[in-house]
Amino acid sequence: MLDVVDLSRLQFALTALYHFIFVPLTLGLSFILVIMETIYVATGKEVYKDMTKFWGKLFGINFALGVTTGIIMEFQFGTNWSYYSHYVGDIFGAPLAIEALLAFFLESTFVGLFFFGWDRLSKGKHLLATYCVAFGSNLSAMWILVANGWMQAPTGSEFNFETVRMEMTNFLDLWLNPVAQSKFLHTLSAGYVTGAFFVLAISSYFLLKGRDFEFAKRSFSVAATFGFIASISVLILGDESGYDIGKAQPVKLAAMEAEFETHPAPAPFLPVAIPNTAEMKNDFAIEIPYLGGVIATRSIDKEIIGLKDLQALNETRVRSGIRAYELFTQLRAEKKANGQVNEETKAQFNEVKKDLGFGLLLKRYTNNVVDATEEQIKQAARDTIPNVGPNFWAFRAMIAAGGLIALLTFGAFVQNLRNKVTQIPLLLKVLLWGLPLPWIAIECGWFLAEYGRQPWATYEILPVGVSASNLSTGDLWFSIGLICALYLAFIIVEMYLMFKYARLGPSALKTGKYYFEQSAK
């Protein structure tokens, strides 16, 4: 039966994955609009203005729903994860506050000028507004991913036993965290691919129907070029992000590669496996010798530490965490009784406080952490190993979808260069029906990032099990049902409007120049 923590996780997963349906398209379309309008201002060709306005209409529908779902998601830090907000809010809240005050206000202000300023602003000023929308969207993503990067690999912070909170010690370390920056660039390029693939798919639909040829062909050309470059960036930056995560979170690396044993370097790569987390082995696996180690460590002499060895290391850290928790409670008692603490006790605590989070893992099994049994200690260590199967297959689904996207954007780019886009209808059909591919890759990537971090809300600092609010299961089932109903309405509205305007094409602009307007005369 699902408890409060499980239901809180389920609700956050639903809202986060749903919200991220809209985010990558916003990121990608915003820069495609910049490219199209820049060409319009540079050449004066009206077709590029029409392209900017039409794709901007679809961007606007997506943007509105992305903002709405994002607000709902952020509220959960206060409603469902109140102890998390208390424990790490000083750090986690800072980039989110900057995002709201700087990036979100920038993009939301200029998005109004983008839509309503065509007849009120000069070409140059309107182009500047479009650039600000794109810049604001990307800046917003950066600060959100700085916050998420800290959850994955905490830097620039330390625990204060007096306030029982994590406190920021260096903002630059938080901001320039390598994990955060590589995640940001990888997510950004994935968004660019999503926007490009979206334009390619709908342009392919127009070309297959033989409608608005010039408009569709030019849209296809912009998207094919932008998408091909972005798809290469995704592969390169994805490798970099994976490398950084492998150094910061060896458990996640071992889980997504289903490495239960520590193999001599370089480790094999498993394209297919049936992981058995309970017995810490693969029931079936196909191995490609050496490839896994070369890809994951970029060397032939570095090991990928297996999950069995990582569990043993984590058991040692759980024991150290018990000592950290004991010293923490002692310091608190001394402070309360005497108004000051023993410096020797404080020095001892500082030596082991990095393992305090491992001690908190025991809260799932006992309120008296210091007197935890051997079985409870071993169970807490087992909890540090996430369920391998979902991580293993999510990673491979992401790679497979990303590889297909790269091949398709390459094909579109080559055909566009040859000026033979319409000569291979099969390519256009595959681009059209392959539209879900970017979302499959992105959602699998985010699932891997978050599920692979379990059992931690903030890696090796705060377990998920102690982060949740004091709610009832009834409260959570009600809110989950309400959110599902609301989000169902949102997706119906989104799909209706997207299909409506995508089918109309540039005729939706009512300029009198395009297919449905001409055929109605």
Swiss-Prot record:
Entry's Gene Ontology BP terms: aerobic electron transport chain
Entry's cofactor comment: May bind up to 3 heme groups per complex.
Keyword annotations: Cell inner membrane, Cell membrane, Electron transport, Heme, Iron, Membrane, Metal-binding, Oxidoreductase, Transmembrane, Transmembrane helix, Transport
rRNA-binding listed as a keyword: no
Periplasmic topological intervals: 43-94, 150-187, 240-397, 496-521
Amino-acid biosynthesis is among the record's keywords: no
Sites where the protein binds heme 1: 19
Cytoplasmic side: 1-22, 115-129, 208-219, 418-475
A cellular-component GO term for this protein: cytochrome complex
Top EC class for this record: oxidoreductase
Location(s), subcellular: Cell inner membrane
Family to which the UniProt record says this protein belongs: Belongs to the cytochrome ubiquinol oxidase subunit 1 family.
Function comment: Probable cytochrome oxidase subunit.
UniProt protein name: Probable cytochrome oxidase subunit 1
Organism encoding this protein: Haemophilus influenzae (strain ATCC 51907 / DSM 11121 / KW20 / Rd)
